[in-house]
Amino acid sequence: EAMQERQVTIGKQTFKLPEPFFVMATQNPIETEGVYFLPEAQIDRFLIKIVFGYPAKEDEMRVMEENVTFKKFEDFKLKAIVSPEKIIYMQKMTHDIYLDTKIKKYILDLVSKTREKDSKYGEYIELGCSPRASIALFIMAKAEALLQGRNFVIPKDVMTIAQNVMRHRIILSYK
């Protein structure tokens, strides 16, 4: 409810969540002991999934050194790089980004291909992307165009974000 409707309900009372609201989660791909797996419907509610590799040696050195002297969270002296108001402003700016009907059809073609059992790779896909993937591609392509300094979406914007939007929504078959 929080992720989809930006509200929570306790008993008969509903509370709107403050803006900006977003959920970030981490996943350890190796250790699954004591971990509760999320069902596909909940995983689908995450807009994107970004996979990070190991840090560069110099970054890992800094992490190592800072953690040796770490006493409490405040010791890191983290500072906000953007205000909540700026996040809301940027989110609203994406609404003004133009997305042509041809790009919308391109997005629908990408998503629907994951559902075609008779396609070249159909036997390897147990469950294709839901309509939430189309919505996520639509939103993220606009955000990518904005980040690239454009007020319109091009196919490259969709290609740039497609893997992060779709990777957690495609369930592979045993084949």
Annotate the PLM regions.
Residues F22-T26, E31, T69-F73, I87, ...:
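Short amphipathic alpha-helical patches
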Residues V63-M64, I107, V111, I161-M166:
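Short alpha-helical scaffolding segments that buttress acidic/His motifs in well-ordered protein cores
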Residues D44, K105, F138-I139:
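Short alpha-helical basic/polar micro-motif
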Residues M3-I97, K142-E144:
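Canonical AAA+ ATPase core
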Residues R115-K175:
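C-terminal engagement/docking regions of AAA+ P-loop ATPases
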Residues D75-S134:
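Conserved AAA+ ATPase small/helical "lid" subdomain
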